[in-house]
Amino acid sequence: MYYGFDIGGTKIALGVFDSTRRLQWEKRVPTPHASYGAFLDAVCELVAEADQRFGVKGSVGIGIPGMPETEDGTLYAANVPAASGKPLRADLSARLDRDVRLDNDANCFALSEAWDDEFTQYPLVMGLILGTGVGGGLVLNGKPITGQSYITGEFGHMRLPVDALTLMGFDFPLRRCGCGQMGCIENYLSGRGFAWLYQHYYHQSLQAPEIIALWEQGDEQAHAHVERYLDLLAVCLGNILTIVDPDLLVIGGGLSNFTAITTQLAERLPRHLLPVARAPRIERARHGDAGGMRGAAFLHLTD
């Protein structure tokens, strides 16, 4: 059995998957903040409960926001302060007497989608998250591609390409990102960026769901905004896809629920790619809230 943990600032979610990658059981508990010991206990107790329930010693994978293992072997996860700065992988491996694998939550999202029954035919899968921020991950032959700093797939911190300024105007503001850089695409393509663009052009403060509702009602201003956003997304993806050249692009995050993104993006991409390049198949993420657990569990699938 494959145990997958999706750990965040508020909850620890465990999903148990069988050899056919089907969810057999899940349980959630609040994320302990009092101490590292309490955090370790919460994870180990869930593993013990799963072992007893299924009568096997399952493999353990964990998806967590941040950098799963820094140079000195410790976790960096600002949203999980009880475990941040601690050697989480080594400590859990010792306590559970098995190989515990960690990766960041965006990589786990991409891995979950790459192992979808319909998507396993694609060797190189790119996951793109358009949510509160912009991120993602890459999966090659069923395994996540993880660089030395765990920043593979941090697409949101690529800067606006020159073609974006041609589209938006050379007086378009380069916003300062939380990472300290100017013009990161996350500030324009995330859910918050979607709303900011609307406010910038129309001087109205609306959230993304409100703008999308207007678009669905046929509002001309919302329609023009969505067209501009999709053009900007295509420009930025043109650079990324030229580097990555994936077989499949899976889009997740809150904005993936807006069908225009997956249905209208493909027709815009070719003009931003090399003439010989083929645009990837584009699909909306299939596994929703279970994706984090699935991807974490599947860190052990290619053994």
UniProtKB/Swiss-Prot annotation:
Tree of life domain: Bacteria
Binding site for Zn(2+): 157, 177, 179, 184
Keywords from the UniProt entry: ATP-binding, Carbohydrate metabolism, Kinase, Metal-binding, Nucleotide-binding, Transferase, Zinc
Binding residues annotated for ATP, in chain numbering: 4-11, 133-140
Catalytic activity from the UniProt record: N-acetyl-D-glucosamine + ATP = N-acetyl-D-glucosamine 6-phosphate + ADP + H(+)
Pathway of action: Cell wall biogenesis; peptidoglycan recycling
Pfam families, alphabetized: ROK (PF00480)
Any one GO MF annotation of this record: ATP binding
One BP annotation, GO: N-acetylglucosamine metabolic process
UniProt-listed Enzyme Commission number(s): 2.7.1.59
Known role: Catalyzes the phosphorylation of N-acetyl-D-glucosamine (GlcNAc) derived from cell-wall degradation, yielding GlcNAc-6-P.
Protein known as: N-acetyl-D-glucosamine kinase
